[in-house]
Regions:
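Secretory targeting and sorting signals
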Residues: 1-33
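Acidic, metal/ion-coordinating pockets
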Residues: 30-359
Length: 359
């Protein structure tokens, strides 16, 4: 399906919506005005968003032999009725070489793909990429700036810089994206007051607001939402449940997350869906695929023009030995079980078909 998406640049602190070729300033959105496969479409009653977790096509110099076809096996799922496809870009698109990891660093990972790889993400169906995470500064401010430019040059919108609200149009409906991570160089989820203000500002610009959070501990032992502050390698990764509930109270229509690199459960709060981690989506030799890390899902959510939940479904994917996503695996049952264990009566009911129902 060809998508009709218009991305706009919204200056933080202003309710005005500006359509600009690009902007780059402290406290300002950097989502450039982008037309994606225009098609005549009157304002509709709903919009469908496909969302995936942590995504990189590889990391220099270990790159896939055929990057343009790396996501071909799951592209039909991304495109299945969705007008917007969102994912977390877990790294940079840059030629910069000055890495955050010094010689002999332990537990330090710096990810970069060539800037031209943005076009492969576009070809796979993506329309909006998040860069609020712990890897956007892997190659410093120069790497971050080149990443944003590369996405825009490929016709992709991005979100996640401090103070940033990214508004796209799909089927005539405005959808605002706001993304957070527990770092001062991102929109910081540890500052609940500032996050609440930003989400409320987004709600004034669009009736449909999607909040993304890069939050929680990492790894195969981090598949449960604890209801408490979570930490990883000494970092405070926030309280995902408290943040998600705050986001909905502030006006979010949908909350999605990744960062733990493993699936987590899903919950309904005040009628709105929260997906606490969509796990990994793609990473040629980047991510471990052992144990529970070899399975994930692609989430489709349909929201009304007023931002209310209408329907949702997860499609299971698994990873080959190189980290390439292919359809299949036990992701449906896995995330359904986790939701029941963690949230009880407020857990999303996930049927064997992947269809998601409110409790």
């Amino acid at each position: 399906m060809r998508k009709t998406v218009r991305a706009c640049c919204a200056i933080a602190g202003s309710a005005a919506l500006l359509v600009l070729p690009a902007c780059w300033a402290a406290g300002a959105s950097t989502a450039g005005a982008v037309e994606v496969s225009p098609r005549a479409a009157p304002a509709a009653s709903s919009v469908t968003i496909a969302a995936v977790g942590d995504t990189m096509l590889g990391t220099t110099p270990d790159l896939p032999p055929n990057p343009g076809s790396y996501l071909d096996a799951v592209r039909p799922i991304l495109d299945r009725g969705a007008q917007i496809v969102f994912g977390n870009l877990e790294g940079t698109l840059t030629t910069a070489t000055a890495s955050k990891c010094g010689a002999g660093s332990a537990n330090c990972f710096a990810f970069r793909d060539p800037p031209g790889y943005a076009r492969y993400l576009k070809q796979a169906g993506f329309t909006v990429l998040n860069d609020a995470n712990n890897h956007i500064l892997d190659f410093g401010a120069a790497g971050q700036a080149q990443t944003v430019r590369s996405l825009h040059a490929a016709g992709l919108a991005q979100t996640g810089l401090p103070g940033e609200i990214t508004v796209v149009r799909a089927r005539g409906i405005k959808v605002a994206f706001v993304a957070f991570a527990p770092y001062p160089y991102d929109a910081n989820l540890l500052n609940l007051s500032a996050a609440r203000t930003l989400i409320k500002r987004a709600r004034r610009q669009a009736r449909v607001v999607v909040v993304y959070m890069h939050a929680g501990a990492e790894g195969s032992g981090a598949d449960h939402v604890t209801g408490r502050e979570e930490h990883y390698l000494g970092e405070d990764r926030g309280n995902p449940e408290a943040f998600a509930h705050m986001a909905i109270d502030a006006g979010a229509s949908l909350v999605i997350a990744s960062g733990p690199h493993v699936l987590r459960g899903m919950q309904f709060y005040k009628g709105h869906l929260i997906a606490y981690s969509l796990g990994n989506f793609a990473g040629y030799h980047n991510f471990s695929t052992s144990g529970d890390l070899d399975t994930s899902v692609i989430l489709h959510v349909t929201l009304s023009a007023a931002g209310r939940f209408k329907s949702a479904r997860v499609y299971p994917i698994r990873f080959t030995g190189t980290g390439r996503p292919v359809p299949g695996g036990g992701g449906i049952a896995f995330t359904a079980r986790l939701g029941t264990e963690d949230f009880g009566s407020s857990a999303a009911r996930i049927l064997a078909s992947g269809v998601i129902k409110a409790p």
